[in-house]
Amino acid sequence: MAGHTVMAVVRDPVKRLLSCYSNRVMHHQELSEQKAGAALQAADLPCDPDLSTFVERLPEYCAAVESIWHHAMPMVEYLGRDPQFYTHLYPIEATATLQAEVERQTGIAAKLKRLQTKGPKIDPGTLSAQEVALLKDFYAEDYTLYGAYC
């Protein structure tokens, strides 16, 4: 990719997971009996889990329901394991900077939108120390490779 600009947006994995729970589980009800009951029953997982249950059994929910995996998978699964591949890595809070860089490089007005914003905002402080530890373990490679950019 020499000579090319390669950009990505990164987000703190715990905050990203909380957003996934808020939007996909609470708002879209993707772990409801109606939408995922059969898959969850087959995996012996409860429908409509509370946050603690979701965190404690995250790998199982990811394996049982594709849309949860899609939104909760570690960043290394789609960004790869070499941050040096990217010429620019932007934390999600810096999308305005990314937008300005895209406009600068292309000469075209760029509009970056956040599309999945529904659901309550969940403060990371609501997680117990044990839940944070579980998530840090699940996302360990993300923190190792991309944590400095979040």
Label each residue range with its predicted role:
Residues A110-C150:
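Charged phosphate-binding loop/patch that engages nucleotide di/tri-phosphates or the phosphate backbone
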Residues M1-V10, K15-K118, I122:
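PAPS-dependent sulfotransferase catalytic domain
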